[in-house]
């Protein structure tokens, strides 16, 4: 009797469940077998290139031809899964391919973010710098209303009374009420290589000096000659709203510096501050010209 030769399991041909082929070349890209093993890729490099080409096709051709040898019911389910996956990849994969470089990184302009940050930082510095042209025919005095150092407070009062006696219009910037005035004074004194010692007077945008300089110029008559082009005030009076300080409590937070979005029921907005006032909870007075 003839004995039938049995082939080992590894030599038996496996049944192919379905195949995926390229729509351009017709080459088989992937095969899935019925035994549940991982699909074998015939050519991974060619498969990736063909897959990208299929995603970027503008005429809406199908990306793969699915063939099945048996089990028609399972074939229909597999076809639906493959078509759904292909459609989703086509919807989102085209954008990904367009913005990705060969190395897989997102394309962009080199140092674009850092250059933009430097540009905006320089722009804010330029806008914050007081211009001498804007202070033409104007007197600006930097003072303080704090009496911690009595000598400084008395010198500020002396300079203020000197300009009030000349009946000229001047702008007083109290650094105790607004911290931005202090930063502005430091920047302007740094440009003229002078120490910011209160009070400081600027006429026509140029640094004039402190209390001693103003007092000596007033006694010699030089100050009166500089004030000939400055606008005169015939009847000086204090603003009834702010009392001549130029600032009022914030109308939004009433001086508490708390944001309107904060409440007593949650601590999620604890760090929010009012954006309508400064660090002291004050706003510029709108009824006076201080």
Swiss-Prot record:
Location of the protein in the cell: Cell projection, Stereocilium; Cell projection, Microvillus; Cell projection, Kinocilium
One GO BP annotation of this record: auditory receptor cell stereocilium organization
Keywords on record: Cell projection, Cilium, Deafness, Hearing
Superkingdom of this protein's organism: Eukaryota
TM ranges: none
One GO CC term, this protein: kinocilium
Keyword Cell cycle: no
Reported tissue expression: In the inner ear, expressed predominantly in sensory hair cells and their stereocilia bundles with higher levels in outer hair cells (OHC) at P1 and in inner hair cells (IHC) at P5. At P1, expression is prominent in each row of stereocilia within bundles including immature shorter stereocilia. Expression is also observed in apical microvilli of sensory cells at P1 and in kinocilia at P1 and P5. In the adult, expression is localized throughout the length of the stereocilia of both OHC and IHC (at protein level).
Pfam families listed in its UniProt record: Glutaredoxin, GRXCR1-2_C
Glutaredoxin domain: residues covered: 127-234
UniProt xrefs under Gene3D superfamilies: Glutaredoxin
Disorder noted: Defects in Grxcr1 are the cause of the pirouette (pi) phenotype which is characterized by vestibular defects and profound deafness with affected mice displaying abnormally thin and slightly shortened sterocilia.
Its job: May play a role in actin filament architecture in developing stereocilia of sensory cells.
Family as reported in the entry's similarity comment: Belongs to the GRXCR1 family.
Entry protein name: Glutaredoxin domain-containing cysteine-rich protein 1
Species of the source: Mus musculus (Mouse)
Lineage, opening ranks: Eukaryota, Metazoa, Chordata, Craniata, Vertebrata
